[in-house]
Amino acid sequence: MSSALPDVSVTDLAPSLSPLQWVGMQGIDLPVRIQEPTYQRELHARADVQVDLPAPHVKGIHMSRLYRLLDAWGQAAAVSPASLFALLQEMIDSHQDCESRSARVRLDFDLLVRRPALVTEGLSGWKSYPVHVLATKVGGALNLSIEVRIGYSSTCPCSAALSRQLIEDGFLRTFKDQPLLEVSAVAQWLRSNASLATPHSQRSEARVRVTVPADAPDLGLLALIDHVEGALRTPVQTAVKRADEQAFAALNGQNLMFVEDAARRIQASLHGYRDSQVHVRHLESLHPHDASAWSAPQAAAPDQQESFATGNER
């Protein structure tokens, strides 16, 4: 019995002599460490790793090499621009016999963050933020982007105005024959009738993608999330008591917004970030469909804008 195992990726020729843009694996389970100034945690991620295959005569790449490099990287390094770019170079170096010159890594995971209640001291709960990290080295150029998804509440300004009109009409009907009103009577009427009509509101989602500088010490995930939530002002809550629910109702009333308002708020707040792209979606309670808006720098390539808009970034 021969001791040498066959390797057809080396001994066989490709049936069609053509280069391939990317070859590799998707959805590899991997523990990753996130270490940022205000966040340190090990999380479960799914990773995609690929290299290019420019040599038309080579039948296939060495996927086990990529897997082992990724596995070793996950054990040895926290996720950072420096560690990701080092991994990309190792992937390229491991495929010199395939003439590979480019590599990319994508990580998908949920950033778990403990969030305090708005008012009640000592009350908090966990909130999950889906994160996508994409690092590439193509033609010697390094690029790293992060994308976060943030849930928030949106209340329709038009619906709020219509509701106020109905409440006003009800008030006038009740007190039209009373030129002088007691404050207590008005207060009593409001307690019973201020919800005569209520504006529609809904859970909403913001997707924000930015480019991370190659020399950044970390990805800045939580900083970006906090930044966007601060711009929106109505992030969904975790654990609440009645006082927190009341405070949340006040925030929604003070921050009425169409989907266009939400997108503009976020984009205007991202002036310190590079290549920012925004997609917001309001899961309408009035309609069976969603309202959406996108925002991207004018300089962004059309294909990049399209992939972000359609969610086809893979």
From Swiss-Prot:
InterPro entries recorded for this chain? GTP_cyclohydrolase_FolE2 (IPR022838), GTP_cyclohydrolase_FolE2/MptA (IPR003801)
The protein depicted here goes by the name GTP cyclohydrolase FolE2
Its job: Converts GTP to 7,8-dihydroneopterin triphosphate.
Catalysis performed (reactions): GTP + H2O = 7,8-dihydroneopterin 3'-triphosphate + formate + H(+)
Record-stated family: Belongs to the GTP cyclohydrolase IV family.
What biological processes does GO assign it? tetrahydrofolate biosynthetic process
GO MF, one term, reads: GTP cyclohydrolase I activity
Q: Please give the pathway this protein is involved in.
A: Cofactor biosynthesis; 7,8-dihydroneopterin triphosphate biosynthesis; 7,8-dihydroneopterin triphosphate from GTP: step 1/1
Task: Site May be catalytically important: give positions.
Answer: C156
Instruction: Give me the stretches of Polar residues compositional bias.
Output: 305-314
Could you tell me which residues belong to the region Disordered?
Answer: 290-314
Which Pfam families does its entry note?
Answer: GCHY-1 (PF02649)
Principal EC category: hydrolase
Q: Would the keyword Hydrolase be found if you checked this record's keyword annotation? A: yes
Gene encoding the protein:
folE2
Which keywords belong to this entry?
Hydrolase
Enzyme Commission number, as recorded: 3.5.4.16
